[in-house]
Amino acid sequence: MATAALLRGATPGRGGPVWRWRLRAAPRCRLAHSSCSPGGDPTAGAAWACFRLDGRTLLRVRGPDAAPFLLGLLTNELPLPSPAAAGAPPAARAGYAHFLNVQGRTLYDVILYGLQEHSEVSGFLLECDSSVQGALQKHLALYRIRRKVTVEPHPELRVWAVLPSSPEACGAASLQERAGAAAILIRDPRTARMGWRLLTQDEGPALVPGGRLGDLWDYHQHRYLQGVPEGVRDLPPGVALPLESNLAFMNGVSFTKGCYIGQELTARTHHMGVIRKRLFPVRFLDPLPTSGITPGATVLTASGQTVGKFRAGQGNVGLALLWSEKIKGPLHIRASEGAQVALAASVPDWWPTVSK
């Protein structure tokens, strides 16, 4: 199999269009965009921002036992390649999931890309935080035992995020393929607000009409405003709980699949039906101290009651693990210099109504 298969055409799939693979060369052209909504594309003529995510990397998992092997470790079903028309290769699919430890706490968050390696054998690319690629590879090796599975880094492809230049258009704008040299272009499986994921050997802006190189700062600002955790800063290994981290909201857990490592606590919490704390997006209302806000800093109400803890952020936005019933009043953090920094928590409008 070629190290980077090429796009052929779009087919409808769960979560948006997906792209079929082919293995012979194609002329390098751009991808067109059009509206998904009846009212027309609100971003018509607007540029797409392409963010190169050097903090994300890929592991390749393949072999006859790859699917059952991963099913026993992940919180979600696998994104198996979609059925395709006669004579055409199956379409790639993406999914989101966490690896948990035996206590049921998150170790690593991953976006999975399901590929057809060859006849009736599926392979997977696991997108993970670059800083824990080696640790994740060792975690997989620990449980591999005698299964016919290979796990190896896949540096041939780079990870890009693609967003409309107008952030409010994320749920409406779409991309359509004409021809291209990208391996995978697919909607982010976590939420439509996070746009598209692009895995390619080429530069992302070269594949998108009006594409421009985005500032990574803007990507993380957008991500935090949408309440989407990503990587070990937002989801500390062995600390974060999957449902408190909104894994269910981001399509990252199945409560009907078979057993997996760490399932017991997650299933019990789900069936109790009450999740009292969640990761919420927060915005700081006061200037930040020069040293910034320390991860784990206590969030307090005006009366000094503890509401939760700051998790991570960038600039004046971030994520905090807060008691859901206490987020509406004035909140603040006592910074290391002794200053009191006001902040406000919000509920993303893409969350299920029942959670608001």
UniProtKB/Swiss-Prot annotation:
Any GO MF annotation of the entry: transferase activity
SUPFAM superfamilies assigned to the protein according to its UniProt record, in alphabetical order: Folate-binding domain (SSF103025)
Bilayer-crossing regions: none
UniProt family annotation: Belongs to the GcvT family. CAF17/IBA57 subfamily.
Residues annotated with N6-acetyllysine modification: K309
InterPro entries: TrmE/GcvT_dom1, YgfZ/GcvT, YgfZ/GcvT_CS
Role this protein plays: Mitochondrial protein involved in the maturation of mitochondrial [4Fe-4S]-proteins in the late stage of the iron-sulfur cluster assembly pathway. Operates in cooperation with ISCA2 in the maturation of [4Fe-4S] proteins. Involved in the maturation of mitochondrial 2Fe-2S proteins in the late stage of the iron-sulfur cluster assembly pathway.
Outcome recorded upon mutating C259A: Abolishes the formation of the [2Fe-2S] ISCA2-IBA57 complex formation
Known partners and oligomeric status: Monomer. Heterotetramer; forms a dimer of dimers with ISCA2. Interacts with [2Fe-2S]-ISCA2 forming the heterodimer [2Fe- 2S]-ISCA2-IBA57 complex; [2Fe-2S] cluster binding is absolutely required to promote the complex formation.
PANTHER family: TRANSFERASE CAF17, MITOCHONDRIAL-RELATED
Cell location: Mitochondrion
Organism: Homo sapiens (Human)
One of the protein's GO biological processes: heme biosynthetic process
Keyword Transit peptide set for record: yes
Gene name in the database record: IBA57
The keyword Acetylation belongs to this UniProt entry's keyword annotation: yes
Disease note: Multiple mitochondrial dysfunctions syndrome 3: A severe disorder of systemic energy metabolism, resulting in weakness, respiratory failure, lack of neurologic development, lactic acidosis, hyperglycinemia and early death. Some patients show failure to thrive, pulmonary hypertension, hypotonia and irritability. Biochemical features include severe combined deficiency of the 2-oxoacid dehydrogenases, defective lipoic acid synthesis and reduction in activity of mitochondrial respiratory chain complexes.
Keywords carried by this UniProt record: Acetylation, Disease variant, Heme biosynthesis, Hereditary spastic paraplegia, Mitochondrion, Neurodegeneration, Primary mitochondrial disease, Transit peptide
Pfam families: Beta-barrel_CAF17_C
Disulfide bridge map: none
Assigned GO CC terms: mitochondrial matrix; mitochondrion
Coiled-coil intervals, chain numbering: none
Residue span of the annotated presequence: 1-39
Tissue-specific expression: Expressed in skin fibroblasts and skeletal muscle (at protein level).
Sequence positions bearing N6-succinyllysine: K309
Protein's recorded name: Iron-sulfur cluster assembly factor IBA57, mitochondrial
Chief place where the protein resides: mitochondrion
